[in-house]
């Protein structure tokens, strides 16, 4: 099957992927259904499995096909969130105002996972990430998607969740990643430190096991050794990304991001 440009392929993800040729896609950005959080009303849907192990197995099967379809230099960006074990029956935790869950979804209030205690955080993102690594993927980065406007939670015995994971996965050791396109400005204090002098007695001018030499910014130098044109104005993007979700007036099971 030849992939057509500017065409949306609808269907079961695993079945559609199996029809696509090898090494045909440069990038995959996806957020599969989270485990035991929503019911989309589809038979055989991912996310309603009886155990976390079954969920991880199905996700791994889908991404095995993604890896086959991905080009050797391609990248895959996987957004996924975690799930808590329930503490009792659904009736015990049902919100009378939203008997079917907010936005109409059937939330697994009472979901329990073998091997986990009630109220345990299951650790779904890392179970998936490690399973994909075991299936041959290169696990290159774990990125924190930080939301400053998270959904409120009524819990009073733990912090409110305000982040999800984004995993960068690759098919090969070497792949396409344009770091300059996503670079961020250096802090003004960094430029100031580079312009200043550093004495040989600087406490940071030491090595530690596994580090051959001190960081560049801490090496002994005369004041003014670094001119403005010698200092890069940008640095590699870090792995905590603050991206808020956008508010919408219509029913939407997953809120879009602002950017």
Q: What role is predicted for each listed range?
A:
Residues 1-253, 259:
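Core catalytic lobe of class I
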């Amino acid at each position: 099957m030849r992939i057509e440009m500017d065409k949306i392929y609808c269907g079961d993800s695993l079945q559609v992927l199996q029809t696509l040729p090898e090494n045909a896609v440069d990038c995959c950005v996806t957020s599969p259904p989270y485990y035991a959080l929503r019911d989309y009303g589809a038979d055989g849907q991912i996310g309603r499995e009886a155990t976390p192990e079954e969920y991880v197995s199905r996700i791994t099967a889908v991404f095995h096909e993604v890896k086959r379809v991905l080009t050797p230099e391609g990248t895959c960006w996987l957004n996924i969130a975690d799930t808590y074990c329930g503490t009792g029956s659904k009736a015990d935790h049902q919100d009378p105002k939203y008997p079917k869950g907010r936005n109409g979804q059937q939330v697994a209030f009472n979901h329990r996972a073998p091997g986990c205690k009630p109220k345990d955080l299951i650790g779904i993102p890392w179970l998936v990430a490690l399973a994909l690594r075991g299936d041959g993927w290169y696990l290159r980065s774990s990125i924190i998607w930080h939301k400053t406007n998270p959904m409120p939670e009524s819990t009073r015995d733990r912090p409110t969740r305000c982040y999800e994971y984004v995993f960068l996965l690759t098919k090969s050791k070497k792949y396409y990643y344009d770091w300059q396109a996503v670079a961020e400005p250096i802090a003004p204090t960094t430029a100031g430190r580079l312009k200043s002098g550093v004495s040989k007695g600087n406490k940071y001018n030491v090595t530690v096991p596994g580090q051959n030499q001190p960081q560049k910014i801490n090496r002994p130098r005369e004041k003014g050794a670094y001119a403005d044109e010698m200092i890069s104005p940008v640095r590699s993007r870090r792995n905590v990304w603050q991206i808020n979700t956008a508010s919408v007036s219509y029913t939407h099971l997953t809120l879009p991001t602002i950017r």
